[in-house]
C-alpha cells in the first residue's frame, strides 16, 4: 500500500465473498493511524448500493479499518450520541485510491449507552450457504465477532467517546485546511 498523507481522499468499495460489489462510498478522508487502525472520516457522502440506488449519509462518521482483525468500525456522531456500526469483514487493502474489503454480513450495532445488538444473522447464514464460506472463514468470522464484542464491553479503542471526538475534530481541521488551499 502507498503511504497515505493526512487529507488524502479515497473511495470505499465493499464486496461480497463472490467478488461482486456490494456498496461504495464516494469519500473517505485520511486522518491518521495507530498500530491497530487506519482512520478516515467523512460527512454526508454519497453511497451507492449494488442495485444502483444512491443515498447520502446523514451525519459525520469516523471510520476505523483494523490492520490486524477482520472488522471495521464506523463511529457515527449523531445528535443523540455516538453510535457505532461494526462490519465483520476481511482485512482491507488500498488499491487505485480505494479502500477495499469483503463484507461478511454480520454486523454489530453499538448504542450510546454501550448496549449492542448483533445484526444480519439470517443474511450471514444465507450467504454462507450460497457463497460456500469455508469452515475456516466461518470460524474466523465468529471469533472476530466475539473479539469485537469484548472490545465494546471493555471500552477499548475506538469505543471511547473522547477518542472519537478527537478524531472528528482532527477531521474537521483537515477539511478546513483543504478548503483554504
Tell me what each language-model feature is.
Residues 1-60:
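Charge-rich, low-complexity N-terminal segments
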Residues 15-17, 33, 45, 68, ...:
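Generic structural motif
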Residues 22-26, 57-59, 68-72, 101-105:
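Short, surface-exposed coil-to-beta transition loops
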Residues 49-94:
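The feature represents the first ordered module of a protein
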Residues 79-135:
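Conserved, surface-exposed functional patches that form binding/active-site neighborhoods
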Residues 94, 137-139, 160, 180:
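Juxtamembrane/interface motifs at transmembrane-helix termini
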Residues 118, 127-154:
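A contiguous, mid-protein "functional segment" used to position or interact
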Residues 145-181:
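Cysteine/selenocysteine-centered motifs that mediate thiol-based redox chemistry or coordinate metal-sulfur cofactors
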Amino acid at each position: 500500500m502507498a503511504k497515505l498523507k493526512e487529507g488524502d481522499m479515497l473511495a470505499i468499495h465493499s464486496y461480497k465473498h463472490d467478488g461482486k460489489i456490494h456498496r461504495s462510498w464516494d469519500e473517505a478522508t485520511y486522518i491518521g493511524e495507530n498500530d491497530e487502525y487506519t482512520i478516515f472520516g467523512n460527512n454526508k457522502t454519497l453511497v451507492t448500493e449494488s442495485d444502483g440506488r444512491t443515498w447520502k449519509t446523514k451525519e459525520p462518521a469516523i471510520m476505523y479499518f483494523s490492520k490486524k482483525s477482520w472488522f471495521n468500525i464506523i463511529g457515527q456522531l449523531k445528535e443523540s450520541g455516538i453510535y457505532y456500526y461494526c462490519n465483520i469483514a476481511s482485512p482491507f487493502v488500498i488499491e487505485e485510491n480505494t479502500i477495499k474489503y469483503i463484507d461478511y454480513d454480520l454486523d454489530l450495532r453499538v448504542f450510546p449507552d454501550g448496549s449492542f445488538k448483533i445484526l444480519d444473522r439470517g443474511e450471514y447464514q444465507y450467504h454462507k450457504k450460497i457463497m460456500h464460506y469455508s469452515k475456516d472463514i466461518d470460524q474466523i468470522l465468529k471469533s472476530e465477532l466475539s473479539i469485537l464484542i469484548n472490545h465494546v464491553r471493555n471500552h477499548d479503542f475506538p469505543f471511547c467517546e473522547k477518542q472519537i471526538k478527537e478524531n472528528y475534530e482532527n477531521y474537521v481541521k483537515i477539511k478546513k485546511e483543504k478548503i483554504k488551499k
